[in-house]
């Protein structure tokens, strides 16, 4: 199978490495100097230092149309902010297309309260609905995938051809790929878990204990499910890899950038300091406001996400954000909106 991966960050490189032993894979970097450095060193020093790239993996820059010529699967491994441009550039492509990003697009008009960012499948529907497209998501740190550690992901698309292509491309000895046609649920899980991970990082940074962490994860899953149901997702999707699975990993894993933001805020760092120290994107910081804004518009209650936004905006201190949750009136345990 011939695969072209757009984007030589950690995740794009990790999947390219994973598939290169079984398929003909081209890893395309936007920056020519980066591509040359990776190809020469056979290592992505910036994103996956110490990991040798397999000899069969081709790394290139330059003409993207030429790089993906004849590809049977195109994988877009760019941040959410670049997805719209990438999908527009892929108009006319007949091969299946899949993106890897999780979160929401930055609002097109940040000054307008009525403007909010879109999930990836909504961008797809706006700019290139003719593409056969979908998402590869689930609980995964790029470093572990690149090292060949056991991982399970979900390929989500309304098109069976896209799901089948992703399974064929990446399912192997260490990486299991499950198929799901609920792209809305898979993407909601991938976006909301980043917001909730900031909350669990805050919990851990304040040393509130494992009971508190478990409560946040469980009630956070309820918020995620309510939000997803209101957008048309299926409830069972949130008990799968892209829901519960990704939430547990991102909320507890030491490699989680979103959890790290919460930890740093709990230690007294400003948001700007926390983000600057990461060196990479923490999508939860950028999608939290959109999640809350859309939830309000749908009449969905998301108190944990609301607390995270108040914390990020500086309206609540870490301690006040916790108090805003623990001081709530008792309610029945419920997942439904």
Curated annotation (Swiss-Prot):
Compartmental location: Cytoplasm
E.C. code: 1.1.1.94
Coiled coil: none
Pfam families with a match to the protein in the record: NAD_Gly3P_dh_C, NAD_Gly3P_dh_N
The reaction(s) this protein catalyses: sn-glycerol 3-phosphate + NAD(+) = dihydroxyacetone phosphate + NADH + H(+); sn-glycerol 3-phosphate + NADP(+) = dihydroxyacetone phosphate + NADPH + H(+)
Top EC class for this record: oxidoreductase
Binding, NADPH: 11, 30, 102, 142, 257, 281, 283
Binding sites annotated in the UniProt record for sn-glycerol 3-phosphate: 102, 138, 140, 193, 246, 256-258
Catalytic residues (positions): 193 (proton acceptor)
GO CC list: cytosol
Main location: cytoplasm
Pathway: Membrane lipid metabolism; glycerophospholipid metabolism
Gene3D superfamilies: N-(1-d-carboxylethyl)-l-norvaline Dehydrogenase, domain 2, NAD(P)-binding Rossmann-like Domain
One GO MF term attached to the UniProt entry: glycerol-3-phosphate dehydrogenase [NAD(P)+] activity
Alphabetical UniProt keywords: Cytoplasm, Lipid biosynthesis, Lipid metabolism, NAD, NADP, Nucleotide-binding, Oxidoreductase, Phospholipid biosynthesis, Phospholipid metabolism
Swiss-Prot/TrEMBL GO biological process terms: carbohydrate metabolic process; glycerol-3-phosphate biosynthetic process; glycerol-3-phosphate catabolic process; glycerophospholipid metabolic process; phospholipid biosynthetic process
InterPro entries, per the entry: 6-PGluconate_DH-like_C_sf, 6PGD_dom2, G3P_DH_NAD-dep, G3P_DH_NAD-dep_C, G3P_DH_NAD-dep_N, NAD(P)-bd_dom_sf
NCBIfam families: PRK00094.1-2, PRK00094.1-4
Family to which the UniProt record says this protein belongs: Belongs to the NAD-dependent glycerol-3-phosphate dehydrogenase family.
Biological function: Catalyzes the reduction of the glycolytic intermediate dihydroxyacetone phosphate (DHAP) to sn-glycerol 3-phosphate (G3P), the key precursor for phospholipid synthesis.
Name assigned to this protein: Glycerol-3-phosphate dehydrogenase [NAD(P)+]
Organism per entry: Variovorax paradoxus (strain S110)
